[in-house]
Amino acid sequence: VPEPTQGNALTTPDFWGDEFWKLNRDAVPELEIDPDHREFSWLHRFLQQHLPRRPDARLLELGCHPGRYLWYFHTYFGYEVEGVEYVAPAAELTHQALKAHDIEVPIHAADLFDFQPDSDELFDVVCSFGVVEHFADVEPVIRRHGELARPGGLVVIAIPNHAGVNGTVLKWIQPEVYAVHNHMSFRDLKDAIDANAELDYVAGGYLGHFSLAPSNLCPHLRQRLPWKVYALFERIYNGCVRVAHYLPNSRWFSPNAVVVARRRSHDTR
């Protein structure tokens, strides 16, 4: 398996820690997610439909900073959660944020390819939200998700949909950020799952009717426009989002794509 710093990954730890997140070592991230929020409800419903609701289930998130999804799965699914984060300061901040919510769980400062579970038990669910699209070749990353799941366990992979309008906008306003993404479609993601001999596709697709969140457009304009102009833009944008609620999920407008796959319990197809 190639190391993520040896050509396959499109980013480095320095990019995330120093350039992108600009981590404030003294600021503990806010974690709580409203499952009914318009930017999250689509994923909440999907996960409720396809993941087990067992309080003894063990979940591992790869690329877990700032810890919101770990908080979410612990709170709404009752899972025993762990996380892997390869930017060491971000791993520590994630641990602090969860501890502030009385969730004391292991957060491993490690590369996902180097991480080995502390016990012989693998995980019932292995997930990532916005990780695999930062690799030029996603096959080793998807394979690693499957290796960490127990036989019969589930793999959940969600990515921002940069194959549609969000990718076009991001390329226009932040070409340097666009450059560190693999602009894969849902079909590309599903094909990568189907190519893995140890995983069976369960469900997936484009999720969300319309949102420009993956393009970073709103924070980009908020920093550059007079506040009255931005307030007008925000009202127009929010109106578009409400109207778009009636659109079908699609490659062009949906903000995210997601797949659920199951690790095979045997070695043959």
Segment roles from a protein language model:
Residues 81, 155-156:
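A short hydrophobic/small-residue beta-strand
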Residues 1-121, 125, 129, 142, ...:
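Conserved N-terminal segment of class I S-adenosyl-L-methionine
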Residues 181-197:
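Short alpha-helix
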Residues 170, 202-269:
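A C-terminal cap/extension of S-adenosyl-L-methionine-dependent methyltransferases
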Residues 139-154:
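A short glycine-rich, Lys/Arg-flanked "PGG" loop and its adjoining helix->strand segment in the class I
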Residues 158-180:
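Short, glycine-/aromatic-enriched active-site segment of Class I SAM-dependent methyltransferases
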